[in-house]
Amino acid sequence: MSRSLKKGPFADPSLLKKIEQLKGQSKKPVIRTWSRRSTIFPSFIGFTIAVYDGRKHVPVYIQDDMVGHKLGEFVPTRTFRGHAGSDDKKTGK
């Protein structure tokens, strides 16, 4: 289910505050955040945001085609280690 249009998009207030403070600077440092639920706004373009995946912060460079998506969509939380291998030593034909 999508979010109601009446409510509008959500972004963590502390993240918005950090973006606005760094907007005029030429050097843009990496912004660390735990807010995977925040929607990417057009003002985020050009920033690198390190999103927490439960273990570490993964840097994500924000581009214009990411606007409208959530930060958590670009950082997977689960590591796929592969399926169990087949035993070729089974007795058979």
From Swiss-Prot:
Instruction: Name the keywords, alphabetized.
Output: Ribonucleoprotein, Ribosomal protein, RNA-binding, rRNA-binding
Q: Which InterPro entries match?
A: Ribosomal_uS19, Ribosomal_uS19_bac-type, Ribosomal_uS19_CS, Ribosomal_uS19_SF
Signal peptide residue numbers: none
Keyword Endoplasmic reticulum on this protein? no
- Where is it found, in Gene Ontology cellular component terms? cytoplasm; small ribosomal subunit
Q: Which cysteines bridge via disulfide bonds?
A: none
**Which BP terms in the Gene Ontology apply to this protein?**
ribosomal small subunit assembly; translation
Single GO term (MF): rRNA binding
Q: Which domain of life is it from?
A: Bacteria
**Primary role:** Protein S19 forms a complex with S13 that binds strongly to the 16S ribosomal RNA.
Similarity comment text for this entry: Belongs to the universal ribosomal protein uS19 family.
Q: What is this protein called?
A: Small ribosomal subunit protein uS19
